[in-house]
Amino acid sequence: KFIRQNPNKRFLGLNFYVWVYEQADPEKDNWWNRFKRRIGEAPVLLDMSLTEQSVRNLKVYMDYRGFFSSQATYEVDTTSRKKRAFITYRTVQREPYRINRLSYDFRDRFLEQIILPDTVHSLLRTGEVFDMEVLDQERQRITTYLKQRGYYNFTVNNIEYEADTLGGNHLVDLKMIVKQHLAGYNEQGYPILRNNTVYRIDQINIFPNYDPTAAIAPDYRKGLDTIYYRGLNVVYHKDNKRPNIRPSVLRQIVPIYPNYVYNINRVDQTYNQIMSMGYFKSANVIFNEQADSVAKDNYVTFVGEGKEPADSVHQTREGYLQCDIQCIPALKQGYKIELEGSTTSSFYGLRATVGYQNRNIFRGAESFDVSFSVGYEYMKTPSARKRNAIEFGVNMGLQFPRFLLPFRTQRWQSIQMPRTRLEFGINFQDRPYYRRTLSSVAWGYSWSDLKYSSYSLRPIDINVIDMGYVNRKDFLDHLQNEYLKRSYESQFISGLSFSYVYNNQRKHLGGNATLLRFNYEMAGNLLDGLMHLFSRPAAGKDYYEVFGLQYSQYFRADLSVSRKIMLGEVTALVGRLYGGYGMAYGNSTSIPFDRLFYAGGANSMRGWAPRMLGPGAVPEPEDAVFPTQLGDMKLEANLELRFPIWGMF
């Protein structure tokens, strides 16, 4: 970051990249030589001017972090190895300068009543190191704080610092200067300064089918029409006869209303919700000052919002903004066709898949997708009783960019990216040794909050495996993999599931991070209650059946917590704790095999293959070729030190 010259990369301890680069003929400019130069790396030759610049960079950085008495030096060793130079940089930080006194100078006196009450959240404290990086962060924090309260034109350049170090003892008297808004320059070239303006929203125009190419035409606006809906002007072209998205849907995703005080959080929320619909390719939220309201001195009573005391009422200048939201839609419809062929020593196979997607099927950014698949296999084995295998399936999904609920959810301000998804799938397999049908139906909701959490709830989650026929003698009894053998059992699972994920990796990208996952599912309770009321077990059986299948009744929960602690720029200590428990009851004696816990694999103990670690619930036979260790409970912990290996060679 600060050193201007770094050694060449090495491969297995050798200067491989320099060697490749030097194989290129400098007098020939053909593709082969260009390829060598691109793959290789030019040798890094010692440049003392860059070495001096590196020392200056180190000194500037230490000054920037408050170590003004620091020193940076270097030594060059050219004798240890022939034609090689070794540079050693040394830094001495010494005692840092600290903040002795902090004061404020408000050139815009109205901002004093807003900023001073919020100093409890200030990043600047007396006694702390005079770190200019923290000073910049405080400027950004105040700017964001004011932009949340109507100060649209306020920037970090409106805040300056004056530092006085003449008092000695490595102490700094710091003054923050909050300036007025620079409105322009007069005829003599002097700046025109005014108090910062609080802006309200005037008109809100949304273009749900914006075409940037057509918008540059001189007569573009003549062909536009507008529908007004609850403070929102939905602008569309007359040739389309109506907007491509219903105004009521657009109103739900735009949390900006006329006469609202400008708030940058609502602007970000508007952009995120538009893009999360999945229908628009890009979007722009543009604000323009209304000249008629800005030009005149329009003084109104403004009550500071947020953390200010209730009596902080003052007179400030007010302006208005026109909001234009330009939404460029993606391709509405699409399809795919896939053909796949396969061959082994046992069979020939051919599979075809046709899929269709509509991203706006009901003019509300609803996404509908459906796919059909057909497969055929021909067995090469002449002794097989049946040499043909057929498989076909249908999968459908319908997703709404909102909650489908019998009550309104507009008041839930913390909910972001709400989704409702309906899914249906069925797959029929007719093979020489078995015949089965796999089907699933699900109704689920998903959403996230304003920070790091995401949620998923499936109140309806049904999965059915119906084994119509299986040849035990010639097929099932010969399977040595117990996990594979149990996959050919019929099962009926009807329940609900919930999952929660907390992940602050996006906020602390490259730094410390925490990842928490919680999953819970419960099956069979509602169905079991209905069966007890209206039915009874079949003769000779102590359990209930639905469509001739025993339904599962159980609950299952698991929790995983991971923590990453950076020990340097590329080295990290990562710890993980996992716990899970499941229990069958009522109509079941065991949890479905694919819901049991196991250890090993990429998401568990990576040193072991999946389902091969741990005793599980039932010990495996000693002669088992494919051990399958499954259980009703799992506790797991691991600790990893992650560091790059490539750079070590």
Tell what function each PLM region has.
Residues 1-276, 285, 320:
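Interaction-mediating elements
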Residues 85-87, 172-174, 321-323, 352, ...:
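Hydrophobic residues positioned within well-ordered beta-strands of beta-sheet architectures
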Residues 111-114, 243-244, 260-517, 532, ...:
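Gram-negative/organellar outer-membrane beta-barrel architecture
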Residues 89-95, 106-108, 176-182, 208, ...:
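Flexible glycine-/small-residue-rich
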Residues 67-72, 152-156, 348-352, 392-394, ...:
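Amphipathic hydrophobic-ligand
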Residues 342-345, 456-648:
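C-terminal outer-membrane beta-barrel translocator/porin domains of Gram-negative envelope proteins
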Residues 132, 236, 240, 257-260, ...:
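Hydrophobic alpha-helical scaffolding
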